[in-house]
Design a protein with these regions (language model features):
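Bacterial N-terminal signal peptides that target proteins for export
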Residues: 2-12
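C-terminal motif of bacterial Sec signal peptides marking the signal peptidase cleavage site
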Residues: 23-25
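Active-site-proximal N-terminal segment of extracellular/periplasmic enzymes that hydrolyze or transfer
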Residues: 32-76, 82, 496-501
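Active-site-proximal cap/lid insertion segments
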Residues: 37, 52-53, 58, 189-191, ...
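Short, solvent-exposed turn/loop segments enriched in Gly/Ser/Thr/Pro and often Arg
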Residues: 54-61, 72-96, 135-145, 202-207, ...
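Catalytic-site neighborhoods of secreted/periplasmic enzymes
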Residues: 91-199, 204-225
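Substrate-binding rim/cap in mid-to-C-terminal beta-strand-loop elements of soluble/periplasmic
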Residues: 93, 100, 157-159, 298-302, ...
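C-terminal, low-complexity/hydrophilic appendages and adjacent surface loops
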Residues: 141, 217, 339-340, 416-499
Length: 541
C-alpha cells in the first residue's frame, strides 16, 4: 500500500473538531507495510485508571480519543496484566510480569522497594535500537525525584508524582505543556540530526476519581469532591448506573477478596456511594476526569500536528488499569478480574496503516514492550536481540492483519500480588523512617492468578502464604477461591460456584491457567514476595 502521510495530516486537522466516529469491524484485509527509509518516532501516551469503553457517553467531547480511533487501530480486547499503578506500569515498561519485576505493590508504601535498575526497560530497549528515549509525567516505579536515566529515560522533570488528591486536575496540563515544549526543542533537534525519538507522556487523570467521596467518612489517604471548575460541571444522564451497583460483596460465589478489598479501600479513600444517585454522581465525576485529561491529550495531538510529526511518528495510547465505576458495588481498582478493572483502552496510530480499524483479538500489556522494539528495528534478528527475555507478542502482527489471532488461543494472564488491598481491617503501625506501614491478615485469599480468553475468564484467589499450582479439582477448591465467567455477560453468575458446578469447564480452564503461567512465569512459588522490605511475613498481623 502507498504511504498516506498527506491524507493523514489533512484528516487530522479536520479531526480537531469533535465528531462521532463509527468504527469498522474486524474483517479488514491484511496489508503489507512499505519499507521505510528512516525509523519512525514513537510517542507513548498513557492515562491512569481508565477503563475501556466501547462507546463514549453521548454528552462527552472526547476529541482526542475520537481522533485517535479514527486515525488508528483500536484494540478492543486489550487487558492489563496486573494492578495497580506500580505493578501494571512495571509490566508495561519492561515486558515482564510482576513476578520478575518484583513490583508487587505501590512504591509510595514503605514495604515496596524501587524496581531494580538492572531490569531492562523500554527506555533501555529504545536506546539500544538507536532512539533518544525521554519521559514525561507519572512514573511510580521508583521513588526517584529528579532523574530516570538509570532506567533508560532522559529529560524527566515532573518528580515523584503518583496521583494524590486532585493531582490530575493540577498536573496534567503541566505534563502536556512540558511534552509539547520537549517536542519543539529536543524532539525536533533529534530528528534534524537524524535520530528518532521515543517519548513517553504519562497523564494522571482519570486517577483523581480514587479520592472522590461525598460522605463524612473520609479516607486516611485523603478524600475530595469535584473541583470547582467548568470541566467538572457536566452530567451524563444517557449513561445508566450499572445494574449490579448494589450487588452484595458477600454474595454466595464471590471470593472473600472482594469484600476485603472494598471495605479496606473505603478506609483509605472514603466511604463508597450507597445509593444509585450517589453512584451516578461518582460516575459523572469520573467521566469529567476523562474529559479533563482528554483536553490535555488533544492539546498534545494538536502540537504534534503543528510540528508536522504525524508523517513520521507512531502514537500508542493506553491506560495502566481500569476503574470499577460501581460495577458489582465496587469502586477503584485491585484484585479482581471484572471487565471494568482489567479491560483497558489501546489504540495505535501508525502512518503506514489506514485508520478507523479495529482488532477483536485478545492482547495484553505484556505485549507492549515487544511491539515497541519491533516498531523501532529494521529486522527480526536485531529485534530479537534487543528484546531477549521479553515474552509478549508483537502487536505489529495485528497492525498488518487485524484478524491475526494474537492471544486468542492461550489467553492473557493477570497476576496480582499486592498486600495493601487484601484486608478489610488492616493494622497501621509506625515505621522507623517516620512513615506508616500496613499489617494485614496474610491468610486471606487476596492473591490472584487469572486468565482471559475469547470465551471465558477464570481466576484463582489464594493466600500469599499458600502459593499452589492445582492440577485437580479437589486441590483447586481446597486451596483457592475460584471464579469462572462467560465473556460478554454481566459477570454476576460465577459458573465455578459451588464446587461441582461445570467441572469439565473448570478443569479445562484451570489447566489453561497453569499452561500460561508455566510459559510466561515459569515456577510460580511466591519467591518474588521476598522482595518486600524485610520479607512479606513482617507485614502480617
Amino acid at each position: 500500500m502507498k504511504k498516506i502521510f498527506r491524507k493523514v495530516s489533512m484528516f487530522l486537522l479536520m479531526m480537531s473538531m469533535p465528531v462521532s466516529i463509527a468504527l469498522t469491524g474486524c474483517c479488514e484485509e491484511s496489508t503489507t507495510a512499505p519499507e521505510s527509509k528512516e525509523k519512525y518516532n514513537i510517542i507513548f501516551i498513557t492515562t491512569d485508571q481508565e477503563a475501556y469503553m466501547p462507546t463514549f457517553p453521548q454528552e462527552s467531547n472526547y476529541a482526542a480519543r475520537e481522533r485517535l480511533r479514527s486515525l488508528g487501530t483500536t484494540f478492543e480486547k486489550h487487558y492489563a496484566c496486573s494492578n495497580v499503578s506500580t505493578s501494571s506500569r512495571s509490566v508495561m515498561y519492561t515486558g515482564r510480569h510482576v513476578t520478575e519485576t518484583k513490583m508487587l505493590d505501590n512504591t509510595n508504601l514503605v514495604f515496596q522497594p524501587d524496581m531494580d535498575p538492572n531490569i531492562k526497560t523500554v527506555g533501555d530497549m529504545m536506546t539500544e535500537a538507536g532512539y533518544y528515549a525521554a519521559y514525561k509525567g507519572k512514573w511510580h516505579i521508583s521513588r526517584h525525584e529528579d532523574s530516570l536515566e538509570e532506567y533508560g529515560f532522559k529529560d524527566w522533570t515532573e518528580g515523584n508524582i503518583y496521583g494524590s488528591v486532585w493531582e490530575g486536575f493540577h498536573a496534567d496540563s503541566t505534563i502536556a505543556a512540558r511534552a509539547c515544549d520537549w517536542l519543539t526543542t529536543i524532539g525536533m533537534e533529534r530528528n534534524q540530526s537524524g535520530q528518532p525519538f521515543f517519548l513517553a507522556v504519562n497523564f494522571i487523570n482519570p486517577h483523581d476519581i480514587m479520592y472522590f467521596c461525598e460522605s463524612e467518612k473520609t479516607g486516611s489517604f485523603g478524600s475530595a469532591t469535584a473541583p470547582d471548575a467548568p470541566v467538572y460541571k457536566k452530567k451524563y444522564p444517557s449513561v445508566p448506573v450499572p445494574a449490579s451497583w448494589n450487588e452484595s460483596l458477600s454474595k454466595a460465589g464471590r471470593p472473600s477478596a472482594h469484600f476485603q478489598y472494598q471495605k479496606g479501600w473505603d478506609l483509605v479513600t472514603g466511604e463508597s456511594p450507597n445509593t444509585e444517585e450517589e453512584w451516578r454522581t461518582f460516575r459523572d465525576y469520573y467521566f469529567n476526569c476523562i474529559q479533563d485529561c482528554d483536553n490535555q491529550m488533544n492539546r498534545l495531538l494538536d502540537h504534534i500536528q503543528e510540528l508536522g510529526l504525524m508523517e513520521n511518528t507512531i502514537i500508542v495510547y493506553t491506560s495502566d488499569h481500569g476503574e470499577m465505576m460501581g460495577e458489582h458495588c465496587m469502586k477503584g481498582k485491585g484484585g479482581n478480574i471484572y471487565e471494568n478493572n482489567i479491560h483497558v483502552p489501546l489504540i495505535i496510530y501508525h502512518p503506514d496503516y489506514e485508520g478507523g480499524r479495529s482488532c477483536q483479538s485478545i492482547t495484553s500489556h505484556l505485549d507492549l514492550a515487544s511491539t515497541f522494539v519491533d516498531m523501532a528495528t529494521d529486522n527480526a534478528s536485531e529485534s530479537n536481540r534487543i528484546k531477549a527475555g521479553v515474552v509478549g507478542y508483537s502487536l505489529m502482527e495485528a497492525m498488518q492483519n487485524t484478524n491475526a489471532p494474537m492471544r486468542n488461543q492461550e489467553g492473557a494472564l493477570f497476576v496480582y500480588d499486592m498486600i495493601s488491598m487484601m484486608d478489610d481491617d488492616p493494622e497501621v503501625k509506625p515505621h522507623p523512617n517516620g512513615e506508616l506501614e500496613l499489617h494485614v491478615d496474610l491468610n486471606n485469599r487476596g492473591y490472584l492468578r487469572g486468565i482471559v480468553t475469547q470465551d471465558f475468564k477464570f481466576a484463582r484467589y489464594f493466600s500469599p502464604l499458600n502459593f499452589n499450582t492445582p492440577t485437580d479439582l479437589e486441590s483447586l477448591y481446597e486451596n483457592n477461591d475460584v471464579e469462572l465467567y462467560a465473556m460478554g455477560t454481566s459477570e454476576c453468575d460465577n459458573m465455578a460456584h459451588p464446587q461441582g458446578n461445570n467441572p469439565g469447564l473448570v478443569e479445562d480452564y484451570n489447566n489453561k491457567l497453569n499452561c500460561i503461567i508455566s510459559k510466561e512465569i515459569g515456577v510460580d512459588d511466591g519467591r518474588e514476595t521476598s522482595n518486600f522490605i524485610d520479607g512479606i511475613e513482617k507485614y502480617g498481623k
